[in-house]
Amino acid sequence: MAENKYIVGSRDDSDFTTWTAAELAEKIHAREISSQEVTQAHLDRIGEIDGDIHAFLHVGADEALAAASNVDDALAAGDQPTSKLAGVPLALKDVFTTTDAPTTCASKMLEGYMSPYDATVTMRLRAAGIPILGKTNMDEFAMGSSTENSAYGATKNPYDLERTPGGSGGGSSAALAAGMAPLAIGTDTGGSIRQPAALTNTVGVKPTYGTVSRYGLVACASSLDQGGPTARTVLDTALLHEVIAGHDANDSTSSSHAVAPVVEAAKQGASGDLSGVKLGVVKQFEKAEAFQPGVLETYHANLEQLKSQGAELVEVDCPNFDHALNAYYLILPCEVSSNLARFDGMRYGQRRGDDGTRSADQVMSLTRAEGFGPEVKRRIMLGTYALSVGYYDAYYLQAQRVRNLISQDFAKAYEQVDAIVAPVTPSTAFKLGEKVDDPLAMYMFDLFTLPLNLAGVCGMSVPGGFASDSGLPTGLQIMGPAHGDDRLYRVGAAFEAGRS
């Protein structure tokens, strides 16, 4: 098979795009290489291949190199690194506000919009000395599972340019897989970090709800959205998790709970030993109808590997998971219809038809009609209907009751096990255009990831190998209890070590 030029190559001392973030940080901090060299190497890689992949919506070369220069100058002056990742560049999903780059959420509604403030995640990255290479492509307002809902064109999977990298954060994961960035930030509302990670052979973590600030994260569904770290190794992901997590007074849903010791856990897991660890296998997931045979085969091989590493597998019964998809796709549109009401053409973003002949209502209507894409409109309509008089109790409140039962299922499971393992997706990456006209088929792709968001607990996707029938990447999902994020990293790092 011919070598795929779009996939990051094997480790090469002369090519910084093949190094892990931990390796880059060590050498930058020892002043054996410079952050500017590393950042430029990744900018060159973006220039070389992103025209074909379209992972980035905006590249900020000057800003990234200036940030890298600041790190190099501080180290040369004898200062200590401002974080364990200082000098290592990163790709940021275009749903976090930035003062020096547009924040579009991949929507025409926010085309060219410049935020007057940085998101807390953005501020923490800057304070940590991490150069931001640019803003990555996504499904519009984080609504979708393929990045095809972007108003600026789909991102392509580096493993097969005819296929999706997943969504909504396909741009961040594609950038990692292609060696355009060693680190990236995503958001996960129903699987938007974990699902692209699985389809691109990368690592993605959805932290416990409330542990990464949502201040400056443009809201899709406020009770479900959570920013999180992505990278190519479990340790790199843990190092980034440590940078962005922690209480934030600007976010009313921010948790004051101490950040879990994720880096320590990743290092502990690197031994590969899982003796004494109990892992739950969800009974309901085994009977999913939409499984691609190669994905199920790889998943069962992953379970055997975990057993060989000393883990005990325990079947757990989560009966309400069968209703998670229905509950999620009621709760999410309801929150979407409320959150996106602010995009009215009056205060910020696009304004259409304001020629002096139309009323404010007409301008607002035209702005929303032209500014939002089909999937966003679909979810606004669904949510508005479900919240309307006469339907609120039957739909929204009932979905919230199911959500509570799903949380109880998780709580009961974690009384028996330390973590739960599951597939991430029912199939490997599908072809672009294959599901775009079938929203229900697209929604089914989130079957294994969204229960976790409804419960507010944490989860990871770690590379699980390649499916025998498609030759494409799969992911193993590891789920932990609230504030048990360190368990993900211990099990994930051990599984990663066992595979290598």
Swiss-Prot record:
EC number: 6.3.5.7
Annotated keywords: ATP-binding, Ligase, Nucleotide-binding, Protein biosynthesis
Lineage of the species this protein comes from: Bacteria, Bacillati, Actinomycetota, Actinomycetes, Mycobacteriales
Primary role: Allows the formation of correctly charged Gln-tRNA(Gln) through the transamidation of misacylated Glu-tRNA(Gln) in organisms which lack glutaminyl-tRNA synthetase. The reaction takes place in the presence of glutamine and ATP through an activated gamma-phospho-Glu-tRNA(Gln).
GO BP term (any one): translation
Matches recorded under Gene3D superfamilies: Amidase signature (AS) domain
Catalytic reactions on record: L-glutamyl-tRNA(Gln) + L-glutamine + ATP + H2O = L-glutaminyl-tRNA(Gln) + L-glutamate + ADP + phosphate + H(+)
Organism: Corynebacterium jeikeium (strain K411)
Protein name: Glutamyl-tRNA(Gln) amidotransferase subunit A
Protease listed as a keyword: no
One Pfam family recorded for the sequence: Amidase
